[in-house]
Amino acid sequence: MLQNQSSHPSIPAFYINLNRDVSRRARMEEELANSTIQAERIPAIEGRAVPDWLQSFYDDRLGPGEVGCSASHLTICRIIIERNLPFALILEDDARIEKDCRRAIEIAVKLAPCGWDIIRLIETSSRPLQQVGVIDPGRSLVRYLRVPRSTTGLVVSQSGARKLLTPRLVKEPIDVEIRWPWQLDLDVYGIHPPPVTQASGIEVETTIPTRSRPKKRNQLRRMIFNIRKMGLASYLACFFGDREPTPQSEDFYARSHTIGAAGHSTRTVGRQNFGR
């Protein structure tokens, strides 16, 4: 239940919307109002109109839609750094937002271990999860064994923004770069069940390219990255576990000292019952 939420300062929030998509803008403004989130609209960048400061990031290997989506997200990352924001919510204009989304975000950023980069608010995967902390009964902060696709709803920290703005030639769509966190050393978490979903009945241009991928090589990189971030015991428990979030193991707790919501450490909240 939300109580007196409007009396609290708003979390930094932005949503991406093409100037010509007036109906999407109206729908999104209504979503935001219902969830008591105040978000600044950022005009989406067209793939063939990338700003000068991002020109060196792209060549012809990505389609216009992929370039535009990536450039729009990187533009907000730049705003996060310029305004010295500790983190910001980034939404695309096809997001459907649950009423308790804001509260879930406020707790999640307190639970997240020091140095977190991204907290996902949308989930499209059935991969096993590792529980990091309890947001409320039935909802947890988690780490993914395999990061889901979609950038419809993300919370990006300042460190995450800086990593996403690492000078490079962008070879993958933004959702793939986040799904392959080892490329930019992104520390990615998520809220499960997710407080953001994709609105039905809205046509969305996919950002997943159709070209082939070096699957086996990525599997090895993902495994090494996950073991480094999670610890071997936690990785194995998650890998052989089921869909329910697996509590953190001792090797992870020994490395984590973050204080979570209501003064509980990550170790304490990580061992609470997940709605069972």
What residues fall within each predicted segment?
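An acidic/histidine-cluster motif and surrounding catalytic segment
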Residues: 1-91, 95-276
